From Swiss-Prot:
This is Urease accessory protein UreG. Homodimer. UreD, UreF and UreG form a complex that acts as a GTP-hydrolysis-dependent molecular chaperone, activating the urease apoprotein by helping to assemble the nickel containing metallocenter of UreC. The UreE protein probably delivers the nickel. It comes from Haloquadratum walsbyi (strain DSM 16790 / HBSQ001). GO terms for molecular function: GTP binding; GTPase activity; nickel cation binding. Keywords: Chaperone, Cytoplasm, GTP-binding, Nickel insertion, Nucleotide-binding. GO terms for biological process: urea catabolic process. InterPro entries: CobW/HypB/UreG_nucleotide-bd, P-loop_NTPase, UreG. It is found in: Cytoplasm. Gene3D superfamilies: P-loop containing nucleotide triphosphate hydrolases.
Amino acid sequence: MGYRDVAKVGLGGPVGSGKTALVQQLVPRLDDAGYDLGVIANDIMTQEDAQRLQSSFAGQIEKDLIAGVETGACPHTGIREDPSMNLDKIDEFSESHPELDVVLIESGGDNLAATFNPELADYFIFVISVAEGDDIPRKRGPGITQADLLVINKTDLAPHVDVSLEVLQEDAMEVRGDNPTAFTNCKTGEGIDDIMDIIERSVLFA
């Protein structure tokens, strides 16, 4: 079995938007639902995110199913222009764990232009946070407009940074059409069940 037999979900977004926190919320739910999964964390120069995830998921995911990929100075290179390092990791996962159902691939922090190579990700989630301002969807970067699912995280901060969730919702609908948008607080888990439902419908049961 190779990587083409495994559902691949890519998560991208700016630094600090909550990509790793979203992975930390999704993994226990996927595990509880009976899915065998792996996680790849891309970072510019370190394995810090991968190590954090290995610590978080001790006892839930085997350590060899959590891997780090160091992409160098351009985080989008490893997920778009040359995804070979990520694809090699997925192949390694599949060869050692033929029962694997899904791999979550977290990009290093990038800008609104970040997208995934379709060979690497079957489904693309782009994560932003309300702390970046309620004009972010209107900027229409490819990450915003092309993602299968837009996640707007840190909703609890909205009143503290003078951001309107209603404006974010309206603008997201305008620039994304029928593609879904989800609001989350990854610290508390609010909104994560909705994302799980979307992933199951769109990826795992597709």
